């Protein structure tokens, strides 16, 4: 999680058309490492309609958040730094999961007027530095060439296709620095696995929601929430129809039933999470962010009810090479997923 508000302002002028996307389409075809492919079964793209529950592959429905964390922290993904081949491989994994679950692509429009899963933008170069023992990024030379990056977005379409609730998590991390791999298991493969689990559960139930449930995997969060900022500035579906955003970040560590919430007010998203947490006998406190932030921030600035759910002890081992799979508590991921599932239910059914 970045700490510098100046960095956010520096990135505010980004656009998706600055750098051609020569590498992404071909790389995405072969991006999933063989070691990860061994645990999944690729399916063809499955189209959905507004009148049906997504058609899906049971293999994908049976996966778990821990499976997702294992895949995303694989060494071949090189820490998932935005603008790298590792990020592309992570995006390919997420697209494969969305296709397998039968989610409708909700990214950028293509030439045939259909949507892609990818939502493109570019990032400025950055310089690495340590801040109180945590590896962070600060802005590099803004005159240097920008690098392509992408959010990954898909949805379980509801009976009212003009209204949506977003479940989001950033999938990027810090990459490799000075020969050290930063796997980012808790930050934020845990959040990615958590919201995928919620979507699997919703689809398994086979009940079409009243509102769309959108999965949005943001990239370049570690560089200043660039992916979510880009989406807020140029959404790929109706901005006025976004009822709430439930963002999940670093949710898998610390005491089992203790969570924190970040938001700019006691909005409907906050209230839904607090109510759902009470049903699970968990503690979720709306807390000051103390200079830190996450991807709810630009939605809040744009007057969209949005909240970030995170572990109370999220800073422990954050942005260090020790943020590995063994650091994540599967029981806490399960609890967080159930809280989010109940919160989403309150707004989409």
Describe every region a protein language model picked out.
Residues 64-67, 71, 85-97, 116, ...:
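Extracytoplasmic/secreted proteins, especially bacterial periplasmic and envelope-associated proteins
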Residues 167-173, 177-223, 340:
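Alpha-helical metal-binding/catalytic segments enriched in His/Glu/Asp
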Residues 80-155:
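A non-catalytic alpha/beta surface segment that caps or lines the substrate-entry region
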Residues 53-58, 76-85, 140-142, 179-188, ...:
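Second-shell loop/turn segments in exported
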Residues 1-15:
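N-terminal secretory signal peptides and thylakoid transit peptides that target proteins
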Residues 31-109, 156-157:
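N-terminal hydrophobic or amphipathic helices/low-complexity stretches enriched
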Residues 316-349:
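His/Asp/Glu-rich mid-to-C-terminal helical/loop segments that flank catalytic regions of hydrolases
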Residues 218-317:
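Metal-dependent peptidase/peptidase-like ectodomains
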């Amino acid at each position: 999680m970045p700490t510098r508000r100046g960095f956010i302002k520096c990135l505010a002028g980004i656009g998706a058309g600055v750098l051609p996307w020569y590498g992404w389409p071909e790389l995405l075809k072969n991006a999933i490492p063989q070691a990860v492919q061994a645990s999944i079964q690729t399916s063809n793209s499955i189209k959905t309609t507004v009148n049906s529950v997504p058609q899906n592959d049971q293999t994908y429905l049976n996966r778990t958040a821990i499976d997702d964390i294992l895949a995303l922290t694989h060494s071949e993904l090189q820490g998932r730094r935005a603008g790298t081949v590792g990020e592309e491989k992570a995006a390919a994994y997420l697209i494969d999961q969305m296709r397998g679950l039968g989610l409708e692509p909700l990214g950028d429009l293509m030439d045939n007027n259909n949507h892609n899963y990818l939502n493109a933008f570019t990032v400025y170069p950055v310089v690495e530095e340590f801040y109180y023992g945590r590896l962070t990024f600060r802005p590099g030379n803004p005159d240097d060439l920008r690098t392509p990056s992408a959010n990954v977005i898909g949805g379980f379409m509801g009976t009212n296709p003009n209204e949506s609730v977003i479940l989001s998590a950033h999938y990027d991390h810090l990459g490799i620095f000075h020969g050290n791999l930063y796997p980012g298991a808790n930050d934020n493969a845990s959040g990615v696995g958590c919201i995928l689990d919620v979507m699997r559960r919703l689809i398994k139930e086979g009940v079409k929601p009243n509102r769309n449930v959108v999965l949005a995997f943001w990239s370049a969060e570690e560089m200043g929430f660039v992916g979510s900022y880009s989406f807020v500035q140029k959404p790929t579906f109706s901005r006025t129809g976004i009822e709430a955003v439930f963002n999940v970040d670093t949710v898998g560590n610390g005491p089992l039933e203790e969570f924190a919430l970040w938001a700019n007010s006691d909005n409907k998203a906050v209230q839904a999470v607090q109510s759902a947490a009470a049903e699970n006998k968990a503690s979720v406190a709306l807390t000051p962010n103390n200079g830190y932030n996450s991807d709810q921030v630009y939605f809040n600035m744009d007057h969209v009810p949005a909240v970030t759910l995170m572990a109370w002890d999220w800073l422990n081992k954050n942005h260090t090479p020790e943020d590995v799979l063994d650091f994540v508590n599967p029981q806490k991921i399960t609890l967080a997923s159930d809280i989010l599932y109940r919160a989403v239910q309150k707004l989409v059914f």
